Amino acid sequence: MPKLGMREIRRAQLIDATLRSIDEAGLPGTTLASVAQRANISTGIVSHYFGDKDGLLEATMRHVLRDLWAATTRRRAAASDAPRARLRAVVAANFDDTQISAPVMKTWLAFWSQSMHEPTLRRLQRVNTRRLHSNLCAEFAKTLPRARAREAASGLAALIDGLWLRGALAGKPLDTKAALKLANDYIDQLLAPRV
């Protein structure tokens, strides 16, 4: 009889091994066997929990996305009700420590690439994109006309993705302070009174 709670412990162990495998070997070098080896268990157990490599990547991305959504919720809850503060909180969540480690950044890049080919991953990407846009648009709409709020949300989302992508590809630790300053300056420009 399996131990109570062992399923979640095992899944977390395998997701961590997947993150490490993608970090060290990339997505092409990540196999059920390489994940099993890193987790020190049999390939059959990996297959039992996730089915195949796509299932493993999906579960890993769901984990990373839950961390992102938790960071967003936590940072928004700590911010004042002012739209500027709440927008900055959403931006900061995207550069949270849970999102900028080398294993997570490489997994994001692999996920984005695979989401163009795998319907389940594409759906996860769309949910994430819509959630970000919705969060940004809701805050911008508190001070900007609706059409302008949508444009501002699209622009800030693109800036977040661009800063994050450049940071991920830089080959060195992401300069979160510089990224946050650029994004926050952009927010300030968008919310500045128009003459």
From Swiss-Prot:
GO terms, biological process: glycine betaine biosynthetic process from choline; negative regulation of DNA-templated transcription
DNA-binding region: 31-50
Pfam families, alphabetized: TetR_C_6, TetR_N
Residues covered by the HTH tetR-type domain: 8-68
Keyword flag Transcription: yes
Record pathway: Amine and polyamine biosynthesis; betaine biosynthesis via choline pathway [regulation]
This protein's UniProt keywords: DNA-binding, Repressor, Transcription, Transcription regulation
InterPro entries, alphabetized: BetI_C, DNA-bd_HTH_TetR-type_CS, Homeodomain-like_sf, HTH-type_TetR-like_transc_reg, HTH_TetR, Tet_transcr_reg_TetR-rel_C_sf, Tscrpt_rep_BetI
GO terms, molecular function: DNA-binding transcription factor activity; transcription cis-regulatory region binding
PANTHER family: HTH-TYPE TRANSCRIPTIONAL REGULATOR BETI (PTHR30055:SF234), HTH-TYPE TRANSCRIPTIONAL REGULATOR RUTR (PTHR30055)
Role: Repressor involved in the biosynthesis of the osmoprotectant glycine betaine. It represses transcription of the choline transporter BetT and the genes of BetAB involved in the synthesis of glycine betaine.
NCBIfam families: betaine_BetI, PRK00767.1
Protein name: HTH-type transcriptional regulator BetI
Record lineage: Bacteria, Pseudomonadati, Pseudomonadota, Betaproteobacteria, Burkholderiales
